[in-house]
Curated annotation (Swiss-Prot):
One of its GO terms (biological process) is DNA repair. Homohexamer. Forms an RuvA(8)-RuvB(12)-Holliday junction (HJ) complex. HJ DNA is sandwiched between 2 RuvA tetramers; dsDNA enters through RuvA and exits via RuvB. An RuvB hexamer assembles on each DNA strand where it exits the tetramer. Each RuvB hexamer is contacted by two RuvA subunits (via domain III) on 2 adjacent RuvB subunits; this complex drives branch migration. In the full resolvosome a probable DNA-RuvA(4)-RuvB(12)-RuvC(2) complex forms which resolves the HJ. The gene is ruvB. It comes from Xanthomonas campestris pv. campestris (strain B100). SUPFAM superfamilies: P-loop containing nucleoside triphosphate hydrolases, Winged helix' DNA-binding domain. Residues 257-346 are annotated as: Head domain (RuvB-H). The lineage of its organism: Bacteria, Pseudomonadati, Pseudomonadota, Gammaproteobacteria, Lysobacterales. One of its GO terms (cellular component) is cytoplasm. This is Holliday junction branch migration complex subunit RuvB. GO terms for molecular function: ATP binding; ATP hydrolysis activity; four-way junction DNA binding; four-way junction helicase activity. Coiled coil: none annotated.
């Protein structure tokens, strides 16, 4: 079982509390994701000009990139209320009906982890999204009857880290689909500088850049690292964060210049030492690391693959020469990964 990692992209209670104070309210303050921002600005302005509810939005991408934040920004820009829930919380059709019937015209309903909705709940959601109506069963047995309830026009924003698990009927009902990408170090530096200013942290630009480049392209991780470096600086550097202080704090946290922690390095080294660099199946790798398959696929692998340290081939996972060099090893000539091989999630 994985302990809470400093560079984990999943949200902690501390993250949720801190995010509330630094979360941008407007698109102008939402840094990065420029193509998404440009498109959403047009959709929002068009909906406001027509006086209509904006079309339903599906936002997907790795954890920590700002899906929830973007939903808040959209609601603020539209000038409407936002209701927040998640797929696992909506257990029964009645739970969803209660949420929908309490919405005001043009409100935004945000459902996180929407891929985890049950089939029964999804069936209620379809007519709600298409026709702004829901069918409710009243009574039991032979006396049961269905009544149709009209809903005010609303915008559903669904967020997921696993878009492939969405059913086709649900996915097809979203008129706007946006994918959030990992952030560049430059974009994350701007985010760290902004967060430091809001939180009253004394942080130099080079200190912010050092935090940003180790944040795995993820704002949530960047803000968490900023808080940990702030703790270090308060004890060791009179509260001042510069390049040297940031580097010393990262060394204490065991987060290397690539943004990898012990679990990342252990995964790469396990593939090298136990499986001769790969290929290795995900189940074998998960067993060797004593981790769940989902943890590898959703938490560890995406960034390693995106940075070119790991590839998925038809035969399994393989490390690249870049991974050997990062571990201080010489890449074997006969183990160069076959980049041209087709990818395989399994």
């Amino acid at each position: 079982m994985t302990e809470q990692r400093t560079i984990a992209s999943s949200a902690t209670r501390e993250d949720e509390a801190a995010d509330a104070s630094i979360r941008p309210k407007r698109l102008a303050d939402y840094l990065g994701q420029q193509p998404v921002r440009d498109q959403m600005e047009i959709y929002i302005q068009a909906a406001k000009a027509r006086g209509e509810a904006m079309d339903h939005v599906l936002i997907f991408g790795p954890p920590g990139l700002g899906k929830t934040t973007l939903s808040h920004v959209i609601a603020n820009e539209l000038g409407v209320s936002l209701r927040v829930t998640s797929g696992p919380v909506i257990e029964k059709a009645g739970d969803l009906a209660a949420l929908l019937t309490n919405l005001q015209p043009h409100d935004v309903l945000f459902i996180d982890e929407i891929h985890r909705l049950s089939p029964v709940v999804e069936e209620v959601l379809y007519p709600a999204m298409e026709d702004f109506q829901i069918d409710i069963m009243i009574g039991d047995g032979p006396a049961a009857r269905s009544i149709k309830i009209d809903l005010p026009p609303f915008t559903l924003i669904g967020a997921t880290t696993r878009a492939g698990l969405l059913t086709a009927p649900l996915r097809d009902r979203f008129g706007i689909v946006q994918r959030l990408e990992f952030y560049s170090p430059q974009e994350l530096t701007r985010i760290v500088i902004r967060s430091a200013a809001i939180l009253g942290i004394d942080c130099t630009p080079d200190g912010a850049a050092e935090i940003a480049r180790r944040a795995r392209g993820t704002p949530r991780i960047a803000n968490r690292l900023l808080r940990r470096v702030r703790d270090f600086a308060q004890v060791k550097a009179a509260g001042h964060i510069d390049l040297a202080v940031a580097q010393a704090a990262m060394q204490m946290l065991k987060v290397d210049p690539e943004g990898f922690d012990e679990l990342d390095r252990r995964m790469l080294r396990t593939i090298v030492d136990h499986f001769d660099g790969g290929p290795v199946g995900v189940e074998s790798l998960a067993a060797s690391l004593s981790e769940e398959r989902g943890t590898l696929e959703d938490v560890i692998e995406p960034y390693l693959i995106q940075q070119g340290f790991l590839i998925r081939t038809a035969r399994g996972r393989m490390v690249t020469p870049k991974a050997y060099l990062h571990l201080g090893l010489k890449p074997p000539r006969d183990r160069a990964p076959a980049i041209g091989e087709p990818g395989d999630l399994f």
